[in-house]
């Protein structure tokens, strides 16, 4: 019995000793880690050490001027950390040493009295929102070592009027200069290939931008709401133009898409109310929805051969457009493509056209005649509704589908020819066609909709 008691005591002692040793080991490890990452103070600055390098993490409240040293107690200062000076609202001047290689996210964000910043010659990257919301920042100079700008770096810097970007800059995130309302001119360095989404969105005084020859992509909303931008030369290397890239650029007067462009997003030039000329060339197969909608001064459009489809509402409410020739490669016209083009007098439909979408020419009141191509199969709802100047509609034998209200309100329509392939006339197809004296119904017609001929 005593033998078992002694064995039990020994086992318990072993377990306790092992636990103590593990706790001690963990304690040493934890203390060691804490010591290496502990925040320390140097004057008004706080910093931490990483592998012998110092990272600035903050400063005392109320500081108005900062001179960041190149080294602290022999350790080189290589970084300004994330949120290091976030909302230091009394900070007015900062001096950065060449030893700083990176500036962290939101490092100076919200420093509303900071007026000028020079990013040192050794800095390679400036992270997201580093200077965002610095509303009194007037000038920013980036040293030629800077290769990367994160997103929203200067977003909301509404006093920023002068920017000098690094000659070696390669990548820019989105929204870099969003809502920089004092910015007037910018030259993008030659190595930048992609202009990020919303880069200059809301730059209400921006009138001149130089894009690099090697740029291949302009992403969504890049120049949205830049009303002072009157002209821009797109580089020949450009292949992609994103959603709403120039939307609401109400001062833009002309645009020409380069030969290499293969993709144009929806609303690319929507509401460019001063746009008078547009040339779409190159390898674009499909043009985005609402691409030129509400471009009220657009009078001249050139569409290149190779297009297969015109997007919905592409020229919606382009009230100054008088004539357009659609390339023979186009087989489909989308919904509301020319709806509301009240000055449109002449349109040349492509020989390979098979489908006209609903509302495609709705309320084109100046359109007097349309030559329908021989391959046309269907015409969508209200496609020519409200075309009060249209005098005749001679459909080819291939047309077998008419939507409802196709010619509703065509008050000048006097002559109509319908294909025998049509089996149904939808409701109000010829309603209010008051000058139409007679019509020969298709041989295969089985259904006439409600109010089809009501006048």
Predicted regions and their residues:
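Consensus positions within tandem repeat domains that build extended binding/scaffold surfaces
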Residues: 81-84, 104-107, 127-132, 150-155, ...
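Conserved functional micro-motifs across diverse proteins
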Residues: 55-56
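Sec-dependent signal peptide cleavage junction
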Residues: 20-39
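Sec-dependent N-terminal signal peptides of Gram-positive bacterial secreted proteins and lipoproteins
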Residues: 3-26
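Short linear/disordered segments characteristic of secreted peptide precursors
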Residues: 27-30, 195, 333
